[in-house]
């Protein structure tokens, strides 16, 4: 099965080792992709645990689950991954999800830092194009599966 983060790798060889705790992301982009996957498969404990120590205060898995309830995350596009310093990177991405039968995008530039030798999500800047979007049903699916949107992820609308 292809990974939920839309990489070319299978889930087992991409994000699963990070989410299961058998391995740690070696780059900010790997962490960002695994956090997206954790949202997609509803592993909110992993999302919480990968916040920076400063930002993790007061965040619970239950809070994350409540804020994401109703969202079905299905596609991710990484635009840029910038390695500015050895202990901090930024990743610009767009994540796509369905909620209440509507299509949304989250376009963010995220800041990641290294704490105790591990990459952590610190914060992000949302871009102005976040929100509900229209996407042609006959266009290629956003997940990169080489099918038309209407024959691929659009069939998963709840």
Predicted regions and their residues:
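Long C-terminal interaction/binding lobes of large macromolecular proteins
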Residues: 90-92, 119-123, 129, 139, ...
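Short helix-adjacent coil turns
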Residues: 35, 39-46
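Short Cys/His-rich zinc-binding micro-motifs
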Residues: 1-9, 137-146, 154
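Short, low-complexity N-terminal intrinsically disordered segments enriched in polar/charged residues
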Residues: 1-34
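Surface-exposed, charged secondary-structure patches
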Residues: 68-105
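Cysteine-centered loop/knuckle micro-motif
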Residues: 13-15, 150-153
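Short solvent-exposed beta->alpha transition segments
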Residues: 49-78
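Short beta-strand edge/turn micro-motifs at domain boundaries
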Residues: 107-134
């Amino acid at each position: 099965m292809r990974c939920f983060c839309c990489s070319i790798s299978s889930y087992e060889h991409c994000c699963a080792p990070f989410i299961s705790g058998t391995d740690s992301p070696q780059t900010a982009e790997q962490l960002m992709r695994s956090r997206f996957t954790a949202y997609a498969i509803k592993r909110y404990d992993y999302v919480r645990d990968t916040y920076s120590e400063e930002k993790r205060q007061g965040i619970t898995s239950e809070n994350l689950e409540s804020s994401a309830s109703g969202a079905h995350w299905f596609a991710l596009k990484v635009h840029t991954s910038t390695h500015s310093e050895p202990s901090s990177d930024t990743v610009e991405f767009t994540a796509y999800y369905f909620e209440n039968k509507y299509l949304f995008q989250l376009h963010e530039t995220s800041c990641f830092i290294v704490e105790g030798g591990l990459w952590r999500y610190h914060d992000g800047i949302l871009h102005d194009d976040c929100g509900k979007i229209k996407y042609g049903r006959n266009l290629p699916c956003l997940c990169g599966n080489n099918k038309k949107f209407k024959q691929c992820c659009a069939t998963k609308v709840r």
